[in-house]
From Swiss-Prot:
This is Spore coat protein W. Keywords: Sporulation. Residues 65-105 are annotated as: Disordered. The gene is cotW. It comes from Bacillus subtilis (strain 168). One of its GO terms (biological process) is sporulation resulting in formation of a cellular spore.
Length: 105
């Protein structure tokens, strides 16, 4: 069995990971010729640092997502404030257009 096959088996034994991440890591390892026996052991301190790094990145990405959602909501609210209400005549015309559109479909 080749080193790559052993490496794939080791990856399969790991807990469920995002398939995209798993594929990217596997491609990077194979690109640089990294095999199981060439890997060094990671100390507990390094493991802790990596875990903290991952948690920090997750928090930053979550904050970015929340920030984007807030910006979209604010933009939508601002757009609603900027649109003037339709007059009764315009409302009726819009209703007729909607009915015609629905009748044609």
């Amino acid at each position: 069995m080749s080193d790559n096959d052993k490496f794939k088996e080791e990856l399969a034994k790991l807990p469920e990971v995002d398939p995209m991440t798993k594929m990217l890591v596997q491609n990077i390892f194979s690109k640089h010729g990294v095999t199981k026996d060439k890997m060094k052991k990671v100390s507990d301190e390094e493991k802790e640092m990596l875990l903290n790094l991952v948690k920090d990145l997750q928090a930053k990405s979550q904050a970015l997502i929340e920030n984007q959602k807030k910006k979209k909501e604010e933009a939508a609210a601002q757009e609603q404030k900027n649109t003037k209400p339709l007059s009764r005549r315009e409302q009726l015309i819009e209703q007729i257009r909607q009915r015609r559109k629905n009748d044609n479909n």
